[in-house]
């Protein structure tokens, strides 16, 4: 058998080698939030909507100050609009990050500049040891 026949046989036997690569997010960033209060604004990002990927925020290892107080972690996704008030795309609650991790998903959003606003109890200082924004 010729070398090219071996190559063709190997490729046919392994469809994962020739299947299209799954879609990946256009961009992401990871950060840590330390002692933030309600109303804290994350860094912004530009979603060009080239890939059609959902916008998601994942939070892990959340802590409160004062320690042991009840937890609440919310993120409100906002789209920057010049001159007008920014567009609110809804709020997701991620309280699972106190146990392990949790994720909020806003689905596919239109191209534009975005940021998220943190929501927690007014008296709380929230720490999120690992935060990932995917867009």
What do these predicted ranges mean?
Residues 15-22:
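C-terminal segment of classical bacterial N-terminal signal peptides
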Residues 8, 19, 94-96:
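Intrinsically disordered, low-complexity repeat segments enriched in small/polar residues
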Residues 1-8:
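Bacterial N-terminal signal peptides that target proteins for export
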Residues 24-135:
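Post-signal peptide N-terminal regions of Sec-secreted extracellular proteins
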């Amino acid at each position: 058998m010729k070398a090219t026949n071996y190559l063709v046989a190997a490729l046919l036997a392994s469809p994962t080698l020739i299947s299209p690569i799954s879609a990946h997010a256009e961009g992401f960033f990871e950060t840590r939030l330390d002692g933030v209060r309600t109303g804290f604004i994350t860094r912004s990002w530009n979603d060009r909507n080239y890939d059609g990927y959902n916008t998601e925020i994942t939070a892990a290892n959340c802590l409160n100050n004062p320690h042991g107080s009840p937890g609440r972690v919310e993120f409100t996704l906002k789209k920057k609009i010049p001159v007008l008030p920014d567009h609110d795309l809804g709020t997701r609650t991620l309280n699972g990050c106190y146990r392990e991790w949790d994720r909020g998903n806003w689905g596919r959003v239109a191209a534009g500049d975005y940021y998220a606003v943190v929501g927690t109890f007014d008296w709380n200082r929230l720490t999120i040891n690992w935060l990932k924004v995917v867009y």
